[in-house]
A protein has these predicted regions:
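Mature extracytoplasmic/periplasmic domains
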Residues: 271-330
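Short beta-strand->loop
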Residues: 107-115, 129-131, 158, 233, ...
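Extracytoplasmic ligand-binding site segments that recognize negatively charged/polar headgroups
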Residues: 42-49, 86-227
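Early extracytoplasmic/lumenal segment of secretory-pathway proteins
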Residues: 32-98
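A ligand-binding cleft/hinge motif common to bilobed small-molecule-binding domains
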Residues: 96-99, 232-251
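A bilobed periplasmic-binding-protein/Venus flytrap-type ligand-binding module shared by bacterial periplasmic
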Residues: 140-147, 184-186, 264-277, 295
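N-terminal secretory signal peptides and thylakoid transit peptides that target proteins
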Residues: 1-19
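Periplasmic-binding protein-like
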Residues: 137, 200, 204-209, 238, ...
Length: 355
């Protein structure tokens, strides 16, 4: 769904505005300068529309139209408009960037035209700079800390004491791929990095988890089953689905076993043939600015991707930030170029395993 953030008074004011900006500025009416972008259909997307968009419109003398969606829907929007692009910037997770690049839907980001790119941690630039992360969640297990001790190793979740005590994320979600990598690491004794290429050896181990699975869940609301004591462990899940509950005092917390934690990266890409390229680059730069990065991180409890942002200790305990914390968590990002062509077959086998 496309939403136009517009009212008559704002339109008249913006049309008349010719605001000087540090870069990317050309004289034109706001009516002529319409930037269309894709944002996530989430609390984060709503926050960007409320806190970032109005100031951006005012500064650049333009209107910003937003389309809300998740990665797959946003990729579909780019395919549908390939011959006549309407978007200049599209939100997509790191998992979507290789596919978008392969299909020729996006262009590389010009490093010299987006000043804040220089502050981005290299691990959050994807596919020869065809995408950049701007918000990072951590994926691991979640528990009720009043009932379950932190999980030291993923091997523990296979213990018979957890029979019918685990919530397993649906095979439809990316998190299921992460659980397969975990099973492969346990089966082979290899690191997560190595085990992602050895998944044929992980299926038997994954099947061993079946007696412990209470249910397969496909909605964030179901994580409350752990808080209510109906289950002991859940996962693999992103921290952005858990930590907001933790902050409210609900008995839910993340647990990151010694094998490592996974990244969940929200990103941005410059659309090929972007009709408002300069405004699009300015939009990306704005979302990577220290001020916006700090605001988004504190509101959504997902880490920034740029260096040098300062947080209170209360905020930092929820974030994979700064660099030292990333290393302590043994933070790992899968090789999506390897995984994506195999994912359909894995999904089918996953469904068979847990049917």
């Amino acid at each position: 769904m496309t939403k136009v953030i517009l009212n008559r008074r704002a339109f008249v004011a913006a049309t008349a505005a010719t605001v000087a900006t540090p870069y990317f500025y050309t004289r034109a009416s706001a009516q002529d300068r319409v930037l269309q972008v894709g944002v996530y259909n989430s609390a984060q997307g709503g926050l960007i529309k409320k806190e970032v968009l109005p100031a951006f419109e005012k500064e650049f003398g333009c209107k910003v139209l937003t389309t809300e969606g998740a990665t797959l829907a946003n990729l579909a929007s780019l395919r549908a408009t390939r011959d006549n692009p309407i978007y200049s910037v599209m939100s997509m997770d790191d998992v979507g960037v290789p596919q978008a690049k392969a299909e020729g839907l996006i262009d590389p980001l010009p490093m010299d035209e987006i000043p804040n790119l220089k502050n981005v941690f290299p691990r959050y630039l994807f596919e020869d700079n065809h995408g950049v992360g701007f918000s990072v969640s951590i994926a691991g297990l979640f528990i009720n800390p009043q009932m379950t001790q932190p999980i030291q190793s993923y091997e523990e979740i296979f213990d018979p004491k957890y029979a019918r005590k685990m919530l397993l994320n649906t095979p439809k979600n990316t998190q299921s791929v992460l659980m397969l990598i975990v099973a492969s690491a346990l089966a082979t004794g290899k690191s997560l990095q190595e085990a992602q290429y050895m998944t044929d050896e992980g299926w038997t181990k994954l099947a061993d988890l079946k007696p412990n699975v209470l249910t397969i869940y496909d909605g964030e609301a179901q994580v409350m089953m752990v808080a209510q004591g109906q289950a002991s462990i859940g996962g693999i899940e992103y921290s952005k689905a858990i930590y907001p509950h933790t902050r409210k005092g609900i008995p839910l917390d993340m647990s990151f076993p010694k094998e490592g934690a996974f990244t969940g990266i929200n990103g941005l890409a410059l659309v090929k043939g972007a009709p408002q390229r300069e405004l699009g680059l300015a939009w990306i730069d704005r979302l990577l600015s220290p001020e916006v990065q700090k605001m988004l991180a504190e509101a959504t409890l997902s880490a920034p991707t740029v260096n040098g942002v300062e947080f209170s200790d209360d905020s930092l305990k929820y974030l994979a930030y700064p660099q030292e914390q990333m290393e302590e968590l043994n933070l790992f990002t899968p090789d999506w170029n390897y995984i994506i062509p195999r994912r359909a077959a894995w999904l089918e086998k996953y469904n068979t395993t847990f049917s």
